[in-house]
Structure formats: structure tokens, C-alpha cells
Amino acid sequence: EKEYGSAEVMKKDDLMYAAFYSRSAAYSKNPKTPGGFFFDLETMKPLINNPGFVEALTDWVEATKYVPPGGINFGLGDEIGSFGGGQTLFSFSWDDAFVAAMQPDSPINNKVGAAQLPGAMKVWNRKTNSWDEGFNQAPFFVWGWAVGVAKKSKEKEMAFDYLCFFANEANHQ
């Protein structure tokens, strides 16, 4: 079977927005312009129509050349199966694809690794309305599936206990 470059969630209304935001963060989340990613926090003006998001969309369209047949209609399950089944070299997704690739019946079992999302060689600066050149990596956790305790927290143990309580499945019955 022919192999392809990338498996991504591209199907409309099936987490496509999440994949797009993950791709666009490196181009549009500038460390020199703190504050909102989706909206300007002072004006609440949407930021999605800035050149950083447009550049990400341009990249995404380019990536469609390297997906398997039908890949532009991949939902999350399709993306996981494509990568885990050894059809694609790269999965731009959550860890589910990695887990699928590590299954005993996967042709790529024990032949894969995981890394942060790629960065970009420029990032849009909405304060100067220009590109800042240089590498920018701004991983974006869709759905907020990450928690942590601030290094400077005065109540680290209490904060950690709080997180453990809400992460316990028994507390969600």
C-alpha cells in the first residue's frame, strides 16, 4: 500500500477547528503580544482574520497534497487509523494516534515517537501589524486537556489535591 505524509483531522464539523487552531498557534500566538489568542482582550475584536491565521490556512491547504485519498474528509477516528495503521508518516493530532501505532497488530509498532507540534519561522505581531522573523513554537492544547500548579503557588499541595479530586472518574458519576 502506498504511504503518505500526513494524517490530520480535516473533516468539517468533526474537530477540524481544533486541528486548525493547533496549526495556527505558531503563526499567530506571538510571545511579544500577550493576551488573547482568539480575541483582542481590550476590544474583543476577533483575531482569526489576521495574517497569522491566514498563513496557517495556506499551510493547511498545502498539506492536503500529502494526505491519503479521502484525507480531506478524515475525522479523528480516520486520522488515528491512518497513522496507527502505518499509512502515513506523520500524525498532527492527540496521543490517540500514537497509542494506535503502539498496538501489537500495528505495522509501525515500536517504530514511532512523539514530539511537540511544529513551529513556524515567523509569527504575526498584531501590535506592529508585521511579521516577526525567527522560530516560534506555541503548542496549543485544544479542549484544555492540561492542568498544572503554578511554580509560585503558596498552596501547591492543596492545588494538586484539588486537581486530583476533579480528575478522579468516581467524582463524575
Question: Where are the language model's segments positioned?
Answer:
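Extracytoplasmic/periplasmic solute-binding protein
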Residues: 1-45, 88
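Stable alpha-helical elements in mature extracytoplasmic
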Residues: 16, 20-23, 53-60, 79, ...
